[in-house]
């Protein structure tokens, strides 16, 4: 299955331990560990939920993925948006992407925990609320849903970015979710 992955630094493969913020080696990144799938990685450091699907529509038309995997929202929360506003923005984005004719798997990011980048209890609470908002949104939009908070994804010292073991756990969880999507798509 051809899979378009739209996400932030955790999709890109950002390694916060590196001095210049480089990527993990390909063998570590979850996008490179999805066996049996052709993966188009559109992860970008710092990406928040786009206001429209516009930047991805031509890519969807030209590459014809079977499924778009979307995991965004953490940067919105880090920039001060709440879970409700983030989910509303995601709703608009998903409407555009789905109108292009691609099926979508919406993934709730792992909830944040207190650490170097996460100093606020409110931020932690909003990341938990986002999981429920995305679950409801996926039901309303008729797209697939997965909660990465259920996959045992280990985060590094900043409590935002995946560790190498976190990438492996995410790949395992996503592989299972993709099998379920394939079964339903037919």
Set out the residue ranges of the language-model regions.
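General structural signal for secondary-structure boundaries
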Residues: 33, 47-48, 82, 100
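Glycine-centered flexibility sites
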Residues: 7, 13, 43-46, 73, ...
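Alpha-helical cap/lid subdomain in secreted, periplasmic
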Residues: 54-186
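Structural motif
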Residues: 46-55
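Serine-esterase "nucleophile elbow" of acetyl-processing enzymes
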Residues: 1-43, 57-64
């Amino acid at each position: 299955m051809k899979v378009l992955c739209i996400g932030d630094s955790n999709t890109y493969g950002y390694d916060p331990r590196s001095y210049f913020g480089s990527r993990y080696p390909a063998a570590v990144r979850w996008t490179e560990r999805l066996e049996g799938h052709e993966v188009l990685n559109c992860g970008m450091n710092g990406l928040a939920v786009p206001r429209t699907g516009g930047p991805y529509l031509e890519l969807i038309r030209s590459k014809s993925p079977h499924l778009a995997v979307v995991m965004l929202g953490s940067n919105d929360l880090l920039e001060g948006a709440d879970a409700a506003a983030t989910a509303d923005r995601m709703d608009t984005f998903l409407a555009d992407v789905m109108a292009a004719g691609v099926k979508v798997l919406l993934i709730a990011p792992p909830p944040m925990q207190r650490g170097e980048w996460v100093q606020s209890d409110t931020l932690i609470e909003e990341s938990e609320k986002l999981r429920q908002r995305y679950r409801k949104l996926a039901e309303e939009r008729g797209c697939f849903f997965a909660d990465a908070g259920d996959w045992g994804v280990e985060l590094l010292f900043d409590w935002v970015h995946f560790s190498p073991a976190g990438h492996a756990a995410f790949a395992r969880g996503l592989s299972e979710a993709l099998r379920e999507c394939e079964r339903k798509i037919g």
